[in-house]
């Protein structure tokens, strides 16, 4: 089941979505995980996910979830059904585009006081029964195969880009 089905507030489920395991010791049923949790710069208890912060953000970057088909702001919700249902601030950018410029427009706009640009990375020590590691892998880069015409022709898409175009929650709301 997805996290939405299980419920993120389940007392036996710990998520470290912005975390990176640095050390895992122990045996099945009894692990100690040392992890570094990157800051979101958003207080998850205060964020109402209203989106007013995103509306005033002056920075636009390619939306990685939509495979660059559309833009997103430096303060954004990773995807519509994100858990936790809260925003995150991208301070780093993507290598080609800069992230947050600390203009503080979002802080002024946020009625719930959820934004904290001074949040620091946090060391976590978790005692868990099981560890799920979701490393992911980068998708194929079709640019290395020029015979496909990717980026040369507007209507040439990868399979995952086409999946996002067809999705009701994608950049075209499923309309082709």
Label each region the model flagged.
Residues 11-14:
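Short, conserved active-site loop motifs that form the nucleotide-linked donor/cofactor pocket
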Residues 173-176:
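Short, intrinsically disordered, charge-balanced linker/junction segments flanking boundaries
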Residues 169-171:
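N-terminal structural subdomain of ketosynthase/condensing enzymes
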